[in-house]
Amino acid sequence: MAEKKFDFWRDHSLNYLQMAFGYDRHARLQNPDGYGRRTGECGDTVEIYLDIKNGCIRSVTYDTNGCINTNACANTVSHLAEGRTFDEGWEITPDKVIEFLETLPEGNYHCAELAVGAFYAALANYQELQRNSWKKPYQKGQNNDSGNQKNSIHN
């Protein structure tokens, strides 16, 4: 008996498809409250931009040059984070992203690690800017060299 061929549209979960093809959060904020960037060994880069008010994450936008799986993961991080408190943001993990997507291919779990890593970098950047608010006017968002760290994410 022949092995069933994978049908992208029928075999992926609705959550995966919505996150992979949703681009409503795909944007760069000019003056983010927090910014993080990570590049994986696969070459994909994810940049995360946070809008936080009174300790609540109002919006999370992102930019990526990555594959459809990286887009799905970055979009999922944004979806899971919006409306949470800053402290609750740290509870978002690669496993929670994978669980939400349901059908992220196992060979692409590093995409979830990459997206969450960029999000954690943005949370840490927000925390730093809260301690040293004088730095915010000098933050360059997507050109911020301090966030341009290479991740050790494998293909």
Question: What is each PLM-predicted segment?
Answer:
Residues 1-30, 35, 58, 84-88, ...:
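C-terminal binding/interaction regions
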Residues 52, 62-64:
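Hydrophobic residues in beta-strands and at strand termini
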Residues 69-84:
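Alpha-helical support elements that line or immediately flank enzyme active sites
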Residues 29, 39-43:
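A short catalytic or substrate-binding loop motif that flags glycine-/basic-rich loops and adjacent residues
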Residues 44-54:
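Short beta-strand elements
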Residues 56-61, 71:
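Short small-residue beta-strand/loop micro-motif enriched in glycine and branched aliphatics
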Residues 64-73, 111:
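Short, thiol/selenol-centered motifs that function as redox-active sites or metal-ligating centers
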